[in-house]
């Protein structure tokens, strides 16, 4: 029994060492989740550019990039994986490994304004709250004279609402988004992006 436990410890160290060796060669933002034969491993880049969270479903741990995924399966949010942290979960035990020198967290702003689902939690607030607050801050900097505020859906809805409420303006949904069109900005050519732009949003002429 002690011999098998010793071999297991060696295997565990070798697995983590290989992961550390690999991620030391990577520059940029990433969050990784890996399954080995006996463990669940999560890794977040040293700057925390991409999000990664830990949840618990009954007696088992789960990992995902957004807290909304935990809500869907009924899992309880435990915490965020810290920047530069490797989380090893084995036999329902969680171990934290931090092989990188400590760096200042620099999350991707697109997570806050675009990528994250509105109900996902980022730094203690929902993405919806972050976006609405951005609209409020924009209103403080730009005292405009307008009749209505119209968002570009869907990610702009919360920011436009915050902007309108702060300035006491009417908020109207003047654009209708086609939800069957994907994200246009990640398409490889300007021609495709321009084509999809015409099918992505349409003006609601009745308002």
Spans of features found by a protein language model:
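Conserved short alpha-helical segments that host acidic/polar catalytic motifs at enzyme active sites
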Residues: 5-83, 88-147, 152
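Structured, non-catalytic alpha/beta "coupling" segments that mediate domain-domain communication
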Residues: 85, 160-172
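Single conserved hydrophobic/aromatic residue that forms the stacking wall/gate
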Residues: 1-11, 198-207
């Amino acid at each position: 029994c002690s011999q098998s436990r010793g071999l297991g410890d060696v295997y565990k160290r070798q697995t983590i060492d290989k992961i550390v060796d690999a991620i030391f060669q990577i520059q940029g933002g990433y969050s990784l989740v890996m399954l080995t034969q006996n463990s669940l491993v999560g890794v977040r880049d040293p700057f925390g550019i991409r999000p990664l969270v830990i949840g618990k479903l009954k007696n088992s741990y789960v990992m995902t990039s957004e807290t909304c995924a935990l809500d869907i399966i009924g899992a309880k949010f435990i915490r965020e994986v810290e920047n530069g942290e490797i989380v090893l979960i084995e036999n329902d035990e969680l171990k934290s490994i931090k092989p990188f020198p400590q760096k200042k967290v620099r999350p991707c702003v697109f997570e806050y304004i675009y990528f994250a689902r509105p109900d996902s939690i980022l730094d203690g607030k929902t993405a919806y709250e972050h976006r609405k607050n951005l609209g409020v801050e924009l209103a403080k900097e730009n005292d405009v004279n307008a009749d209505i505020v119209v968002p570009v859906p869907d990610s702009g809805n919360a920011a436009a609402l915050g902007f309108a409420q702060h300035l006491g303006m009417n908020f109207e949904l003047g654009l209708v988004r086609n939800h069957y069109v994907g994200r246009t900005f990640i398409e490889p050519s300007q021609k495709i992006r321009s084509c999809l732009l015409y099918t992505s949003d349409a003006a609601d002429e009745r308002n």
